[in-house]
Structures are given as C-alpha cells and as structure tokens.
C-alpha cells in the first residue's frame, strides 16, 4: 500500500483528548481527559488502543490489558493486571498493586489506568493514597475532585475503601 503524499502528521495528546460517557455504576455522566494528575507523581486515567503515552510517564500500571497505549519511550516499569469493573471483583491484589504504585511514584510519574479511569484505577490510586497516610474519605474526595465525580461509582469499590 502506498502512503498518501498529502498526509499530515497529527499528534494525539491524552492530556487534551477527552472521554465522554456515562458510568456503568450509578449512570453518572463524565467528561474527562484520558489522563489526569491526581497528586505528586500519581496520574489516573483510561486508555484507547494506540493512544500515545506521554513521555512524562515513567511507570505504567495497566488494569485493562484489553487495550494498550503506544509507548515511544523507555518505561522504568510496566505492571499489567487484569481487573474487572464488577461488584464482585475480588480485592486481594489491590494492596500489592497500590504498594507498587507508591514505590514507583516516589521516583517518577506513575500512571494507573483502566478503561475509563473511573473505577478500577481509582480504586488502586485511592488505596495507594490511603497506604501513604490519607484517610479513605480524603482519598476519594481528592480523586473525584481531580478526575471526576463519577470516580469510584462502583459501590463495592467505594464500600471496600471506606471500610478500611
């Protein structure tokens, strides 16, 4: 196949591109960038196949292996874990992932992503914040303020965090 001689180079910036939809839990509308900075070196977001990962991200934690970022730079670490946004998702692995996130973000910007950056990744990011000394209420409030009120709309995820 030949290349279109009139083709232009287009860059897609996940900090500017937006995801718009309605959450599966609570039917809450959301309009968010693909990734959002929550606090120092902690980024939260969604993914779309082929979206280019910003070079600022050094550590990538993917909770949604069904779609992948295109990574054009060397990552310091990559962790891929299959999680579901369901009310019967088990929580056994959350502490280990959240601890890993805290280790990574001590060194460099770390992105935790799932499909939309609302529930699975918010669960892990909130738990990382709690393990770092924040109260569950403060962690949930921060994530919702910095990302979307639709974050942690999965009732079992929010209930688990608040019960800690």
Positions of PLM-derived features:
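A phosphate-binding catalytic loop at a beta-strand-loop-alpha-helix junction
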Residues: 108-126
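Charged phosphate-binding loop/patch that engages nucleotide di/tri-phosphates or the phosphate backbone
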Residues: 4-15, 150-164
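Cysteine-based protein phosphatase catalytic domain of the PTP/DSP
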Residues: 23-109, 127-160
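A short, flexible N-terminal coil/short beta segment enriched in small residues
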Residues: 1-25, 50-56
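Short, intrinsically disordered low-complexity segments
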Residues: 6, 15-17, 119, 126, ...
